[in-house]
A protein has these predicted regions:
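Amphipathic alpha-helical linker/stalk segments
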Residues: 57-84
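Amphipathic alpha-helical segments used for helix-helix packing
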Residues: 84-115, 138, 146-150
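Basic, helix-initiating cap at the start of DNA-binding domains
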Residues: 1-22, 26-38, 52
Length: 173
């Protein structure tokens, strides 16, 4: 691993430990740089701000969940595929809901952020569909994301309730 990659990884590990111990708001970039044994300036050579660090931490963890979900994906119809991935993703989002509330509050209206998430779900759910209906795909994606946002907005997010809600919504397809 290169020195740059090693430093990047140390930042992510230190930040994740601090975020989980102290919370996002009570963790400063100075604390992250100190825990990483680097200068604050070096931290900002790797990340633009604290939210970018959080996003990278969550992306790392999310990618592990994504791989597990892909390994067990045997579903064909889009409505079953979206439920399959939602089982994994909603559980992960609920487990880390404090952090996703912060991330979504900062990035939700960012076009690149929206596009990245829409493309991921679209590629997972519709990649092997014999006929791709753009309107149907958009509606399924809307159901997925609105259920996610509504569920994470609850005081105590409930994965089972979110999955049941999504299943009811997509059952019309």
């Amino acid at each position: 691993m290169s020195k740059h990659a090693d430093t990047h990884q140390r930042i992510l590990e230190a930040a994740w430990n601090l975020f989980t111990e102290q919370g996002f708001n009570d963790t400063s970039t100075r604390q992250i740089s100190a825990a990483s044994n680097i200068a604050v300036g070096t931290l900002f050579n790797h990340f633009s701000d604290k939210v970018a660090i959080l996003e990278a931490c969550l992306d790392d963890k999310f990618n592990d969940v994504l791989e597990r979900a892909k390994e067990t994906d045997i579903h064909r119809p889009a409505r079953l595929k979206i439920n399959h991935y939602a089982q994994y993703f909603y559980q992960f989002y609920c487990l880390h809901h404090r952090f996703y509330k912060v991330l979504f509050s900062q990035r939700l209206f960012s076009q690149p952020f929206q596009q990245q998430h829409m493309e991921l779900i679209q590629s997972l759910v519709f990649a092997d569909q014999p006929q791709f209906n753009k309107v149907k795909a958009a509606i399924l994606l809307d159901c997925y994301f609105m259920t996610l946002l509504y569920g994470l907005g609850a005081e105590t997010p409930n994965t089972k309730l979110m999955l049941r809600t999504l299943s009811q919504k997509v059952s019309v397809f």
